[in-house]
Amino acid sequence: MNPYEPVEGLYVNAKQYHRILKRREARAKLEERLRGVQTTKKPYLHESRHKHAMRRPRGPGGRFLTADKVSKLRAQEAAEAAANGGSTGDDVNATNANDATVPATVSSEVTHTSEGYADSNDSRPSSISNSSESPAPINSATASMSPANNTSGNNITSPNVRGELDMSGNIAMSGGPTNTASTSGPVPHDMTVLPQTDSNTSNLMSSGSQLGSFATASTNGNNSTTTTTSSAAHPGSFHKGTNDYSSTLAGNEHSAFPGLDVYHDDSVSAGAAFIPHNPMDSIDHLDVNDPTATGLPVLPASDIDPLNLTGNTQDSMIIGQQTYPSHGSSGTMK
């Protein structure tokens, strides 16, 4: 079959003809789209060629310049530089030389300025001089302290400063300024403050002359013991309280009544309101709302805390509800 001879047309029906036209239109659109993508796609460059392309001079629009145009531009720049009579911006040595002279000039100006402050009649003290004459290392403990803090003793911002209370009632600072700062209020004449001997033990002795009372408190961890003798409120009465949160104290006949018992001497007056009662029963099956129940003290919650109801050789006592005046000692003894 000769391809150059005219070929007799093939017969197709209407449906086949419509399908052939649709296929030709779709193929033409696809070829046109692929042709546009291939023209806009960036060509692949090897790494070395890419670096070379990045070093090549570009003109307006990012297009590479030809060698002829590049030589013309360089000749034009050289002529402009010769006409100006100066060096171009590419002269790195001249720039570095100019930069090297700047620190010396600045340091000399700073030196003269600081000396002028030291010699002039300024409001600042004359002992302040520049850092080149008397260099002093900056310590982290004193970095946050202003010059006013070195003389006042009240504004203390250093984390290493610790305060200690001496015998005269003043706070002596260790690790910071050696000045002493007195407490906010005067120390009463009837109160003696003992120095602290242990980090976990603190003793406080106070005597109240107004009520004739004597109080001693010592703290060891969670245990605190309070001994109080009041001649004004209860003449001849003697109370001792112990708070031990780590153990359960037992009353008479091994009954569980933790942290509560009463000591008293034989010279109890009628004002103390001690009422003999039956031995204490276990607190587990007692009616708390019934004040006449065996072993329950008739006391408000504020008066039960400083009492100790263990170890007495007599019957347990119920102390009537009674308001106890303060003993005049500073601090809470619990």
From Swiss-Prot:
SMART domains (UniProt xref): CBF
InterPro entries, A to Z: CCAAT-binding_factor_CS (IPR018362), NFYA (IPR001289)
Record flagged with keyword Transcription regulation: yes
Keywords, comma-separated and alphabetical: Activator, DNA-binding, Nucleus, Transcription, Transcription regulation
Residues that span the membrane, as ranges: none
Key word DNA-binding present: yes
Stretches with biased composition (Basic residues): 48-58
Protein family (similarity comment): Belongs to the NFYA/HAP2 subunit family.
Protein name, entry field: Transcriptional activator hap2
Organism: Schizosaccharomyces pombe (strain 972 / ATCC 24843)
